């Protein structure tokens, strides 16, 4: 599972995800991508489950790029512990994902397999998503320029 090797501080504030994604909104590597439509924290386990679903559907052909990384520590206190007495230990790691962020990219497989793989990967994530293609991105850029 993904997690940082080293961090400056062990624990962080919860934080909020405001607005749309500042970067990572265009396809950089593959021909197909999975784009977030709403803000959410996505755990390392969810990222791994989605990656496995995508890879399995592609029958290990082509290439998968994971464009998000779980760098936010999520803490939790044990069950049946009273309030107070400090913040809990780091339980797991999550990635903050804003709307518009490309989370996964794939290439090297036919159109129908690519779309189905990303649909199955999206089912493992707690947010609504859209499948985007390089053709969609090109048309959007041309429309912006005009």
Swiss-Prot record:
Entry keyword annotation includes Isomerase: no
Record GO terms (molecular function): rRNA binding; structural constituent of ribosome; tRNA binding
Keywords, ordered alphabetically: Ribonucleoprotein, Ribosomal protein, RNA-binding, rRNA-binding, tRNA-binding
PROSITE patterns, A to Z: RIBOSOMAL_L16_1, RIBOSOMAL_L16_2
The keyword RNA-binding appears for this protein: yes
Biological process, per Gene Ontology: translation
InterPro entries (UniProt xref): Ribosomal_uL16, Ribosomal_uL16_bact-type, Ribosomal_uL16_CS, Ribosomal_uL16_dom, Ribosomal_uL16_sf
Family: Belongs to the universal ribosomal protein uL16 family.
Protein task: Binds 23S rRNA and is also seen to make contacts with the A and possibly P site tRNAs.
Name of the protein described by the UniProt record: Large ribosomal subunit protein uL16
Organism: Caulobacter sp. (strain K31)
Top-level taxonomy: Bacteria, Pseudomonadati, Pseudomonadota, Alphaproteobacteria, Caulobacterales
